[in-house]
Amino acid sequence: HHLADCDLVWHAGDVGNNQVIDALENAKNTQGVFGNIDGTEIRTRWPEFVFEEIEGVKFLMIHIAGAIERYNEKTRALISKYQPDVLVCGHSHILKVKRDQRFKLMHMNPGAVGNHGFHKVRTFLKLDVENGKMANLQAVELGPRSSKSFD
């Protein structure tokens, strides 16, 4: 029920298996990037990065971006090329939303909904995008990492 009012779902990598992609794509308009734990099966379905402008807001998503304001070379090149308003990344599995003053963008890591990683609470982010603005940003907590339900 958490995704019922969503028009688009983005997954920032470490999918794990094709069944997760199938379930998301069957339920919603979904885009994703592969993560470092994802094998060839996932890497042939999802790209390394996604850039999309939605309602006038430019989003860049890549699994491993590096530390905020000190991104890795690949991410810096993508930021330079696309000039995103928002950088969505995964990898750490730790929820973080912070304004990046150096690169003039919003850095977002939604955390992780799965049970693998360093996170203690399973999380994801929801937001509205309309007329060039983001609004109603919510960090949704799904319970402790050992809890397996996601309705």
Give residue spans per PLM region.
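Active-site donor-binding loop signature of nucleotide-sugar glycosyltransferases
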Residues: 54, 64, 110-112, 129, ...
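Conserved beta-sheet core of the metallophosphoesterase superfamily
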Residues: 31, 70-133, 137
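Short, solvent-exposed aromatic-acidic interface loops
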Residues: 137-149
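Glycine-/small-residue-rich active-site loops that bind phosphorylated ligands and cofactors
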Residues: 16, 67, 115
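Divalent metal-coordination and catalytic microenvironments
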Residues: 9, 14, 24, 35, ...
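Acidic, His/Gly-enriched loop-helix segments that form or flank divalent-metal centers
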Residues: 23-26, 37-103
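N-terminal active-site segment of His-dependent metallophosphoesterases
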Residues: 1-30, 38-56, 120-123, 149-151
